[in-house]
Amino acid sequence: MAHKWDINNDLIQGDKLNLWLVTGNTEVGYDVLAYATSCSVQVDQETIDTSSKFSCRWNATRGGRSSYTISADALYTNATGVTSFDTLLALMLGDKNVKWAIGQEVEYKVTGENTCEDNPHTLDTNKPYYTGEALISSVSLEAGNNEIASCSISMTGSGAIVPNNPA
């Protein structure tokens, strides 16, 4: 049976996807990057040249090693106990791989008693998400005139990306 396309259920809005890191700040495991504005994963594969006289005029290649990088941007916060620039800098200077996850957060309903600020931003492990380990290769802080200060993180993967697709 052919797939029935449904844009209301098939697509994920960008602000629903977040980066989480294991920082030790909380007891729940993964901590969301505070005030994140974007996150991305890029997966690359090296190519091995297998061209020979039998290839005629065309190059021939095979897949080689795979690698990935993760990057994210966030607004700068001076809040403590959250995954902020200071947390990212400390993790980078620790020279150790960091466990990470990218996925959707548990849906949070804003009601009369609950405000948006009460949202714990918890990784929804009942929906597809990705995990792995990476070394933080750079963190940066940017503060332009008449702008909210922001920070960025770049990580280089160590080992495989693990797709988690709960049934």
Whereabouts are the PLM-identified features?
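Short, acidic/charged, Gly/Pro-enriched secondary-structure junctions
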Residues: 82-130
